Amino acid sequence: MCRRIFKEQTSENGEIPFYKIGTFGGEADAFISRELFEEYKAKYQYPKKGDILISASGSIGRTVVFTGKNEYFQDSNIVWLNHDKHLDNSFLKCFYSIVKWAGIEGSTIKRLYNDNILNTAITLPSVEEQQKIGAYFENLDNLITLHQRKPIVVNSSSTMNALPNQHLYFQVLE
């Protein structure tokens, strides 16, 4: 997990996006300085490109694939699993989407602790099979996303002869 960032260390503008549990998977609304980012990245654990980040509080189990961009995440609320080459991240992302975390059902304040993650049994097929399963579900997710998008119709208010003065209007079809 990343090192704790305090509110006074953030700003509304800046170089490095800082994701809290409420902005995780969306747009950052806080930023930290490059200097603080570089210091913490060098001193403390930091995810590697392709790691699956998981929310450990709030909307427990929400996942995001870490892109490798310079960004920082809220301490123990956003975690990832360091693992060896016997586990494929695309398969892990699928697993995270269906797992029933032991010990969090019924509690008033939902929280996913390291023990919940580390003590969860997972049956692993071969890495090659994990990659195929992960790719299959990633493609399925992409198809679902494409079908959920609304088409955009583009109408031109002028002819091609008046291209420099052309205006485009966008209409979302319901």
Identify the residue ranges that each predicted region occupies:
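Feature detects amphipathic, helix-rich regulatory segments
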Residues: 1-174
